[in-house]
Amino acid sequence: MSSGCSLRVPVTDQTSHRPWPLPKSRWVMFMRWHDLLFLHWPIRPEYIRPLIPAAIELDTFDGWCWVGIVPFHMSGVRPRYVPLPLSLPELNVRTYVKTAGKSGVWFFSLDAASWIAVRVARWLGLPYYDARMKVESVADIIRYDSVRKHKNSVRAEFHADYGPAGVVYRATPGTLDYWLTERYCLFAALNPDRVVFGEIHHPPWALQHAEVKLEVNTMTQSIGIELPEQRPLAHFARLQEVVAWPIVPLAANA
């Protein structure tokens, strides 16, 4: 990407893979996502349904909901026209939903190690939480430690070593790998009465399978989801560049 306040980013040059056209309005945020780990577990829909507003339809694959935990590190986070970027670790807990003809990510929580980022995101209606986080990398192994420390919140921890395994590939449409990762909008509700929506765009994911040593994971306990004992489906992505559009109340997008 060019330096300074350039309004063009190469990420928007590639759009043929999208399930719907880019928004007509201008994007408002650019960011780079690094060393992402996608962990996913199958969960029966009846356990997810009470956690999502009734107006939002659950998105399932072969009859199953999937709950994901995704730790990563962001850099170059900047609003449009602002040349001073922010870097921070982030860890989200998610499932998948659809409404108004669009399927996307439902965020249960997003933990981040940036006081200002958490405050701005919560003002927008996103369920961000303060966390003490540390990310270290030695060769291809990423050490990720996160402990939620948000005031009046339930403690949630994640401690793991992970890294890539195998060749880089792009998921094929119709496969579970594709369904879990190729998402271009988000939904969330910090307040149960106010669902918010946002569009994002990025190139197709360059995925690898992941090797994971998961030591502690209590990220879903605060929302009442008990993860199965089976090993999660694990994917790794080295880098993704992303642009995002404004977060708006869902009704405003209808």
Regions found by a protein language model. Give the residues of each.
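Hydrophobic, proline/glycine-rich low-complexity stretches
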Residues: 2-78, 216-254
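Internal, well-folded beta-alpha domain core
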Residues: 36, 92-254
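Short, solvent-exposed secondary-structure boundary motifs
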Residues: 49, 84-86, 120-125
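A glycine-rich, hydrophobic loop/mini-helix early in the fold
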Residues: 60-67, 72-111
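Short, surface-exposed, charge-dense and proline/glycine-enriched linear segments
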Residues: 6, 12-15, 84-97, 137-141
